[in-house]
């Protein structure tokens, strides 16, 4: 069978209509190739994806790159397949775009192993439902917001509170401690941030264990609506074929929904609540259901969630919440205290913070830590107005321990050594639980609270206190 060639009949921004011969219509979601001289000199440089069959042998497609320079009558090749993504070792350490082409200037990527980006979620019979904690080495997360392997965590926070640094630290720890692979999907993010992340990962030495797939703000909506699927396809290969525990970061999941809404409007669908696409729940569901543990390996997702106008009832974040196993909330108030990572220990939550999953000791320590911090928060107004002297003896002890806990929740990161000047620390889960248990039990009431700031394990805090005593 020869190549199936069609021709462009209409171009409306990112929407391109293509006419084929009778009986040769490509299927929905098929990738078609066009040579667009505006992009570069290469042949077949523009990929468009079939979205609708209009009748009269015409298909309506959504472009994955700019359509400036296209004219009616141009030839269009039918690939016969969905968008195909290169997978495996070839993509590690590389930056790809939505259609799997490199954008880092380091030459071509091997096309030996390719997978379609549209795939079904694993069957129920293949899924692994046992809950195992993913140790991240970050104290505040492991203690209070434990990540389930194969789970989905949302990271909420404004600009400049440290979402990217926590992400990079987790990429580093998964690579160094577990030998795991990380995939980063930049969905509708700032090009500058994507560039910064690439260089920081390169300098931090974590790039060889990571694959980056970018569809930035400047890309047409078609690319932004597909880039998360392209990255997920890469992660699925490592899970299913190589039996790896993979970490996928999606920054920002809201932009995926936003791009879907733009595509929906371009295709002439009637909008739903707040102008979103009527298929919002199913679009997000198709992506999220592919992120899971199977009997071969797991994909754990960390998704940054932008909340439009801080309205958590907006359909986009509200639909996302339904899929999440937990939320890591980063707080500007904690940044102001100089405590990093700036995770809010009272606002953050995890589905597996439960004695059935973690054991009684871990659960008990985590809840006691939260109770002490909550009590300290309630007493802060009294302290501000009347001072510490007016508190009861019991409250004074609680406040002193809470302040130590607050500082002990900070931690020097490997990827932030340049800013902090302190070597990074990876803290094992049992050491984290033991350290906080000793503080809440009052074993370290005699140590100054400064000794607990920016340390790894509790032993380091004790050494700090000794050094301070000697210096005094």
From Swiss-Prot:
PROSITE patterns in alphabetical order: ATPASE_ALPHA_BETA
Catalytically driven reaction(s): ATP + H2O + 4 H(+)(in) = ADP + phosphate + 5 H(+)(out)
Keyword rRNA-binding: no
Documented EC number(s): 7.1.2.2
Quaternary context: F-type ATPases have 2 components, CF(1) - the catalytic core - and CF(0) - the membrane proton channel. CF(1) has five subunits: alpha(3), beta(3), gamma(1), delta(1), epsilon(1). CF(0) has three main subunits: a(1), b(2) and c(9-12). The alpha and beta chains form an alternating ring which encloses part of the gamma chain. CF(1) is attached to CF(0) by a central stalk formed by the gamma and epsilon chains, while a peripheral stalk is formed by the delta and b chains.
Name the UniProt record assigns to this protein: ATP synthase subunit beta
GO molecular function (one): ATP hydrolysis activity
Organism: Desulfatibacillum aliphaticivorans
Keywords, in A-Z order: ATP synthesis, ATP-binding, Cell inner membrane, Cell membrane, CF(1), Hydrogen ion transport, Ion transport, Membrane, Nucleotide-binding, Translocase, Transport
Main location group: membrane
Binding site for ATP: 157-164
Family: Belongs to the ATPase alpha/beta chains family.
GO cellular component annotations of the record: plasma membrane; proton-transporting ATP synthase complex
Function of the molecule: Produces ATP from ADP in the presence of a proton gradient across the membrane. The catalytic sites are hosted primarily by the beta subunits.
Cellular location(s): Cell inner membrane
The keyword Nucleus is assigned to this record: no
Membrane topology: Peripheral membrane protein
The gene coding this protein: atpD
UniProt enzyme class: translocase
